[in-house]
C-alpha cells in the first residue's frame, strides 16, 4: 500500500564549504570558452536533494537542466512548452497532467519519457520510503547503513507528499492526483535525474529504454529490493564526487551538458547537441570555477583568464574592480535580510515572559522593531556597496523580493513611538534582546551595531548571540537561546509552501514559534488556493497579519556584484564576450534566466 509521508527534510540555512583536488586550470587562449567565477561550489546535479539545491548546484543545474517550468525572481512559474505542458485538469481532487514534447531529449540521445517523472514522484512523495534519516545537532545523517539497506530516497517534498496515489501513465503523459489542494502545483513535479541512468547504475540494465522501464516496473510493483538500489543510486550517484569519477552519468536536458567535474574547484560544460529547445548554447564551453577567493576572482578578470566574476560584494572588492581596465561592473541585491522575532523561547518577545499577556508581548515586539533604523542601515551600510539599495518592505522573500506588498514602509527609527508603546504596556525595566547573527560578516556586524545603538535609546539592551552548534542548527534547535535572528531569507523552490511552513502555527519551519489567529486564517486560505491569479491577494493577507503582530521586519537585500570584461579591456577580442550579465543572486531557487547571456535568442 502507498502511505502518507513519514518525514520531510527542510533546509533552512545552507552554509556550504567544500574542499577539493586540483587540476590544471583553464588558460586564457580559449576560443569559444567562457569562464565564470563564483564563491559557491557545485555539490550535486540532483535538484531533489539539499546538496542539489545549494547555491552552487542551482547555478549549474539552471544551465544544464531543462524542464516543464522554471521560477523567476518574483516566484512566478515560467512554463516551457517546448519541453512539454503542465495542465490542471481538475480542482476536486486537484489533478495535474504532464505531457512531454517529442523533442525533449537527454544529452545522450535518450528521449525524455514519463518514466523520468515517475521516478521523481517516487523519490519526492515519500510513499515508498521505509526508513527515514536520523540527524544530529548539525543536521548530519547518522544512520547511513540503515538508509543503504532500506528504501530511502530521503527527499520528501511538502507538495508531493500530498500526491499519495500512484500516478497514471498514458503514452507521453503522466497524471498526478493530489489528496489535498497544493498551491505550488505548477512547480511541484518536474523532470530531474534520468530514469535510464538510474536503472543502468542500480539495476545493471544496459539498454536505456529497458533500464527506464525497469525503474518504472520496480515503482509500480513496489519491489523493495530493486527500490533499495534505485533509491541509493538516486540519492548519491549525482553528487559531485560521484560525477567526478563517472561524468557519463551527468546526463542532462538543457542547452549545455556536463563534461568535467572537479569537486570544490570547477565544473566544465559543453554544448548539448541533442538540445532542440529555445535558447541554445552560445558558447562551445562554459567553465564555472569556485576555487578562487574574491580578490583572486578580480585578478583573474584583469588577467583575461575569467570573463564573468561574481565575488563577494565588499569595499575591497569594489576598489579592486575599479582598477581593472575596461571592466563592466554591476551591483544589485540578493536575499532579503530580516529581523525575525522569537515568540516561543521564554525570552523578550514571548507572552510567557509577561505572565501570558499576549498584548504586552506584542507591544514589546512592535516597540523593538520601531527602533530599527532601516533608512540608516541602507544609507550607511549597504548603499556604499550597492548605490541603488532601498529599504526592503515586503515580508515574504521566500516567494520573491516583492511578495506580500509594501506592508512595512521605510522610514527612520521611531524612538518616540517605541517609547510610547512600552509605557502604555507598563514595561519599565530594560529588555535584553539576544540577536542570533553571523558577526563574522562585516555587513551584518555593522547593521547590528546600528540596531544596538538605536534600540538602547528606548531601553533595549541588544547583545549578539554566538551560535553554539552553528547558525543554522541554533536557528532551528535553540529557540530559548535567542530573541531575534538577523538572517538572509533565500527564495524557495516551493514558494507558496515556504510561506505556509514558515508562518502557520506548528509549521515545519516555524523557527520563531509564531502563532496568530489572523495569520492562521490567511495561511489556511492560501493553502486552499490553486488559482495562480488569486495568490497575490492571499500573500498580502499573510504579510499584513505578520506586520500587525510584530513578527518580522525586512531590512534590505544583501548587496552583490558581477563584473565582466568590457570592450575597452586589454584582452577584448581574444576571448568570448559576455554581454549584459546581471548580478548573480545565489539566494534564488532557480537561475535559468540569469544564464540568458550564455544562450542564443
Show the residue positions of the predicted features.
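Aromatic- and charge-enriched surface segment that lines or borders ligand/interaction sites
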Residues: 86-150, 172-180, 184-188, 297-300, ...
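Surface-exposed binding/hinge segments that line
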Residues: 136-234
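Ligand/substrate-recognition segments at binding pockets and active sites
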Residues: 262-265, 419-491
Amino acid at each position: 500500500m502507498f502511505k502518507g509521508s513519514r518525514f520531510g527534510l527542510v533546509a533552512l540555512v545552507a552554509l556550504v564549504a567544500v574542499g577539493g583536488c586540483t587540476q590544471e586550470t583553464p588558460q586564457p587562449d580559449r576560443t569559444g570558452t567562457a569562464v565564470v567565477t563564483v564563491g559557491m561550489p557545485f555539490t550535486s546535479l540532483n535538484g531533489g536533494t539539499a546538496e542539489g539545491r545549494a547555491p552552487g548546484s542551482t547555478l549549474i543545474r539552471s544551465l544544464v537542466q531543462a524542464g516543464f517550468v522554471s521560477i523567476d525572481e518574483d516566484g512566478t512559474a515560467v512554463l516551457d512548452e517546448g519541453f512539454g505542458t503542465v495542465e490542471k485538469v481538475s480542482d476536486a481532487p486537484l489533478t495535474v497532467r504532464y505531457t512531454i514534447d517529442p523533442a525533449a531529449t537527454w544529452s545522450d540521445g535518450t528521449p525524455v519519457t514519463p518514466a523520468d517523472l515517475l521516478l521523481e514522484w517516487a523519490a519526492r512523495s515519500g510513499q515508498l520510503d521505509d526508513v527515514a534519516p536520523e540527524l544530529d545537532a548539525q543536521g548530519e545523517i547518522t544512520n547511513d547503513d540503515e538508509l543503504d539497506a532500506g528504501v530511502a530516497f530521503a527527499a520528501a517534498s511538502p507538495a508531493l507528499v500530498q500526491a499519495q496515489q500512484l500516478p497514471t501513465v498514458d503514452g507521453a503523459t503522466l497524471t498526478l492526483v493530489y489528496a489535498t489542494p497544493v498551491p505550488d502545483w505548477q512547480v511541484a513535479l518536474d523532470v530531474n535525474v534520468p530514469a535510464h541512468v538510474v536503472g543502468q547504475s542500480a539495476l545493471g540494465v544496459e539498454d536505456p529504454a529497458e533500464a527506464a522501464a525497469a525503474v518504472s516496473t520496480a515503482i509500480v510493483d513496489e519491489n523493495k529490493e530493486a527500490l533499495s538500489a534505485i533509491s541509493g543510486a538516486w540519492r548519491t550517484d549525482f553528487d559531485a564526487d560521484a560525477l567526478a569519477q563517472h561524468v557519463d552519468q551527468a546526463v542532462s536536458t538543457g542547452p549545455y551538458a556536463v563534461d568535467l567535474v572537479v569537486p570544490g574547484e570547477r565544473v566544465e560544460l559543453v554544448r548539448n547537441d541533442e538540445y532542440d529547445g529555445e535558447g541554445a548554447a552560445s558558447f562551445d564551453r562554459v567553465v564555472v570555477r569556485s576555487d578562487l577567493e574574491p580578490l583572486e576572482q578580480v585578478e583573474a578578470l584583469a588577467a583575461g583568464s575569467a570573463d564573468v566574476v561574481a565575488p563577494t560584494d565588499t569595499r575591497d572588492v569594489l576598489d579592486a574592480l575599479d582598477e581593472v581596465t575596461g571592466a563592466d561592473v554591476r551591483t544589485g541585491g540578493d536575499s532579503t535580510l530580516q529581523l525575525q522575532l522569537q515568540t516561543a523561547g521564554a525570552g523578550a518577545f514571548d507572552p510567557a515572559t509577561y505572565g501570558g499577556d499576549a498584548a504586552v508581548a506584542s507591544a514589546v515586539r512592535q516597540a523593538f522593531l520601531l527602533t530599527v533604523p532601516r533608512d540608516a542601515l541602507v544609507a550607511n551600510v549597504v548603499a556604499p556597496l550597492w548605490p541603488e539599495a532601498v529599504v526592503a518592505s515586503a515580508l515574504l522573500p521566500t516567494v520573491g523580493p516583492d511578495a506580500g506588498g509594501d506592508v512595512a514602509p521605510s522610514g527612520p527609527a521611531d524612538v518616540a513611538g517605541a517609547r510610547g508603546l512600552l509605557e502604555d504596556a507598563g514595561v519599565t525595566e530594560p529588555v535584553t534582546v539576544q540577536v542570533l547573527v553571523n558577526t563574522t560578516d562585516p555587513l551584518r556586524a555593522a547593521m547590528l551595531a546600528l540596531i544596538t545603538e538605536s534600540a538602547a535609546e528606548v531601553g533595549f539592551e541588544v547583545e549578539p548571540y554566538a551560535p553554539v552548534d552553528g547558525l543554522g542548527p541554533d536557528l532551528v534547535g535553540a529557540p530559548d537561546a535567542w530573541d531575534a535572528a538577523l538572517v538572509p531569507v533565500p527564495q524557495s523552490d516551493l514558494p507558496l509552501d515556504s510561506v505556509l511552513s514558515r508562518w502557520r502555527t506548528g509549521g515545519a519551519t516555524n523557527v520563531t514559534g509564531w502563532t496568530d489567529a489572523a495569520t492562521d486564517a490567511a495561511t489556511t486560505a492560501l493553502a486552499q488556493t490553486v488559482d495562480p491569479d488569486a495568490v497575490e491577494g492571499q500573500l498580502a493577507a499573510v504579510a499584513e497579519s505578520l506586520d500587525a503582530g510584530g513578527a518580522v521586519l525586512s531590512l534590505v537585500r544583501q548587496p552583490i556584484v558581477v563584473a565582466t570584461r568590457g570592450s575597452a579591456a586589454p584582452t577584448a577580442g581574444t576571448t568570448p564576450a559576455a554581454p549584459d550579465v546581471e548580478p548573480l543572486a545565489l539566494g534564488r531557487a532557480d537561475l535559468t534566466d540569469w544564464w540568458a547571456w550564455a544562450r542564443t535568442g
